[in-house]
Structure formats: structure tokens, C-alpha cells
Regions:
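Macromolecular interaction modules
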Residues: 1-102
Length: 102
């Protein structure tokens, strides 16, 4: 089954600083061995002005779980994760996700 690693970034202390470093985060993600596609998405703000449940999502797509599991042992993945935690002043969650085609 296709697998993706999803990074869910909580609301950062400084959105401007996060955005300034996000391009580098994407470059690091694309360098991870076995990554087929990288998708970045920004969470829409709530209409009432209250904080959104998250700030950004970054998806790294792989052919299957084994490819994703192997990829996370690479130096490139270490660099990506290091940058993720550096940027994520509000926190970040990293998930392995089984993609279900519907």
C-alpha cells in the first residue's frame, strides 16, 4: 500500500519565521531517498479569528511502508527532521500513514 509521512505543524510563535525557513524544509524533504512526491499545504484560518487546529501540513509520499521505513534511517531524513523541529516552535507531529485509494 502507498505510504506517506505526514508532518503536522502546530501554530508557530512566528509565522513569518516559519515561512522563511519552509522552503529549505521542502528542499530537504525532496532529498530523502525514495520520496516520490512532496505536498505542502497551509491550513485555512478560522473565520472567527480563533487559532486553527494546525498551521501547515507536509506530506512525503512513498511507494510503500518499507520504502518509508528505510528512508527515515537516512542522513537526509535526519536533516529533514532536525529542520522540522527547528521550525516547529509550536510543535510538530510526524505520522506514518497508510494511503487508501478510494
Amino acid at each position: 500500500m502507498p505510504t506517506k509521512i505526514t508532518a503536522i505543524y502546530e501554530n508557530p510563535k512566528s509565522p513569518e519565521a516559519f515561512e522563511a525557513g519552509h522552503g529549505e524544509q521542502i528542499v530537504l524533504a525532496k532529498a530523502i531517498p525514495g520520496v516520490q512526491r512532496v505536498e505542502s499545504a497551509k491550513v485555512w484560518p478560522k473565520e472567527d479569528g480563533s487559532p486553527a487546529p494546525a498551521y501547515r501540513v507536509l506530506d512525503l509520499h512513498f511507494t510503500d511502508y518499507d520504502a518509508a521505513a528505510k528512508a527515515v534511517t537516512s542522513d537526509e531524513a535526519s536533516a529533514f527532521v532536525g529542520k522540522a523541529f527547528e521550525l516547529a516552535t509550536g510543535g510538530v507531529r510526524l505520522l506514518f500513514v497508510d494511503v487508501e485509494e478510494v
